[in-house]
């Protein structure tokens, strides 16, 4: 119900859902958003999987032969990510997404790992990153800020909405990085940005 409820809440605000088009959580996301607000990116496998009935036959359903092209579409065409507990494929997609964000190889986007009520899947996973991966220097402590772990659907929705409250988009023009905002920062806010992040600028300031 979490995937369905979250997708329904986002669709009500004009968002569209894109999932792997399979059964279970993937189907729940499309059911919640509704066929008219959904895309499906299925994978062709010898023993599975048929697209779920909520998207089957829809022109917004595509089928991929390779997992890597499927991941490319899911990441490239999404403005936010909500990940629920799953198997190797879920973890593979999650780690690739975080690696791309960590290294600036994809656009900044909000990422939420949605825990089942009372569950420990993502909490234990996050603890493993914090206690085993970060202390060894394989990731930085601040890499854990790339995502939010919660079991609250409303908090997940708020995280995605809040990310785009002022941020609009980002792009490179030659050697210049342009960040588009809905509201320009005040002089005081700009001064603080230069204090906190001015070292990111090759010359001058932000």
Functional labels for PLM-detected ranges:
Residues 73-83, 132-151:
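Conserved thiamine diphosphate
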Residues 25-30, 119-133:
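Glycine-rich, charge-decorated loop segments at or immediately adjacent to ligand/cofactor-binding or catalytic sites
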Residues 146-147, 153-206:
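SAM-dependent methyltransferases
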Residues 38-49, 84, 98-125, 141-142:
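Short, acidic/small-residue loops that bind anionic groups at enzyme active sites
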Residues 1-43:
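Glycine-rich beta-alpha loop segments
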Residues 1, 43-76:
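Glycine-rich oxoanion-binding loops at beta->alpha junctions
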Residues 60-69, 145-156:
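Short acidic-hydrophobic, aromatic-tinged amphipathic segments that line or gate anion-handling sites
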Residues 64-112:
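Active-site/ligand-binding-proximal alpha/beta "capping" segment
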């Amino acid at each position: 119900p979490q995937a369905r409820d979250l997708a329904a809440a986002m669709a009500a605000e004009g968002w569209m859902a894109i999932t792997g088009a399979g059964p279970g959580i993937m189907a729940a996301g499309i059911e919640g958003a509704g066929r008219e607000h959904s895309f499906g990116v299925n994978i062709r496998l010898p023993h599975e999987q048929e697209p779920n009935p909520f998207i089957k036959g829809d022109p917004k359903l595509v089928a991929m032969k390779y997992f890597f092209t499927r991941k490319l579409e899911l990441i490239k065409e999404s403005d936010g990510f909500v990940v629920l507990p799953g198997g190797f494929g879920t973890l593979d997609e999650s780690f690739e997404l975080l690696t791309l964000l960590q290294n600036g190889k994809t656009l900044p986007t909000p990422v939420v790992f949605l825990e089942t009520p009372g569950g420990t899947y993502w909490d234990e996973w996050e603890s493993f990153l914090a206690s085993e991966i970060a202390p060894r220097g394989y990731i930085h402590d601040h890499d854990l800020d790339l995502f939010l772990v919660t079991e609250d659907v409303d908090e997940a929705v708020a995280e995605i909405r809040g990310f785009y409250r002022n941020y609009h988009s980002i792009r490179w023009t030659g050697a210049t990085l342009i960040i588009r905002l809905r509201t320009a920062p005040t002089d005081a806010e700009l001064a603080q940005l230069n204090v906190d992040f001015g070292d990111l600028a090759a010359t001058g300031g932000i």
